[in-house]
Amino acid sequence: MRNKNIKKVVLAYSGGLDTSAIIPWIKENYSSEVIAFVANVGQNQADLKDIEYKALKSGASQCIIKDLREEFIRDYVYPVLKSGALYEENYLLGTALARPIIAKSQVDLALKLKADGVCHGATGKGNDQVRFETAYVGLAPELKIIAPWREWSFKSRGELLSYLKEKNVKTTASIEKIYSKDENAWHVSTEGGVLEDLWNKPNQDCWTWTNDPKDAPNVPEIISIKIKNGSVIAVNNEFLSPFKCLEKLNLVGIKHGIGRIDVVENRLVGMKSRACYETPGGTILVNALRSLEQLVLDRDSYKWRQQIALEMSYVIYNGNWFSPFRKSLQAAATELATEIDGEVILELYKGTVTAIRKFSPNSLYSKEFATFDQDEVYRQSDADGFIKLYSLPSKIRAINKCMNKALMK
């Protein structure tokens, strides 16, 4: 049942087909003032050029655009990168990471403007509805939530286009645009269309940013990345802000076809879905960080980091960014990353990233101890006592088996 006592709503507005239709629909069905909120998280900047005009023409009372690019990469992407989180061992969580900062900024604006409610354009089949609404209720439970896709009678893009035509709202969307895309500074995703048949190979329409690896340059490119406390601080000896570092890595990654994956994943809402993800800069960063972790983290710390990564991936994917569990995982990941300092030299070539040189002042690797040549620092005879103690449980278990067999005779 619709709550008609909502006088002012802040909508997470993208300028696409869905949110363009939501503005007149809310006004018609709730008699509410609609304020369009646009979060600039690094999506195609050309799409933002006329977005205020589009929102106002659709019926919004005002359109507020906030540049969140630096905050998004610094406070959301980089911290999670330290944890090593990869959802189902593949997905760098590009969409899932953007939702909490959008929702938080939307809620902050709603409270500032004394709005009664917030609204999103996520469908009733996807994960984003859960991510947005879990954030909303966790940050401001007093705000009412409007989720049009769970309320209105529209069933297709064609019906939405007809509705916009009826309301005299212009849109660049069409029946032919069959792919669902999400883009921010960290990644771009593509779903739908030919991807819904698992027997179909992704065509060029399924890739938005990156060159096809086979069409990438025939000559490898060497780059350097400097890292401090698990965060990238410089690319090719140029010290830049978090967003600018990523922007630079994205450009070089796009050129070399880095960061493409085609996956089938388990959605939070129960079904499986297929998507093509492109995370060029992120893929380069992950390789650089893993290279330094191999040098710096001891065995138990590395095992603990792997456990953190697994738990963090589910927490983020499932929309629990603002939970105490996520914060405790983040604290652990941040502590582990305090000694992840150093420099990595990487080779980029036709979709591959290879760390060819690496250095850390905190490295636990010692050439003197690890050498296969004659050395004077590691006495191999010391291993005798260690092996006897380490293998003691196995020895006792074997002795017990022998004794039990003897008793059975």
Curated annotation (Swiss-Prot):
It is found in: Cytoplasm. Pfam families: Arginosuc_syn_C, Arginosuc_synth. GO terms for cellular component: cytoplasm. Pathway: Amino-acid biosynthesis; L-arginine biosynthesis; L-arginine from L-ornithine and carbamoyl phosphate: step 2/3. GO terms for biological process: argininosuccinate metabolic process; L-arginine biosynthetic process; urea cycle. Homotetramer. This is Argininosuccinate synthase. It comes from Buchnera aphidicola subsp. Baizongia pistaciae (strain Bp). The gene is argG.
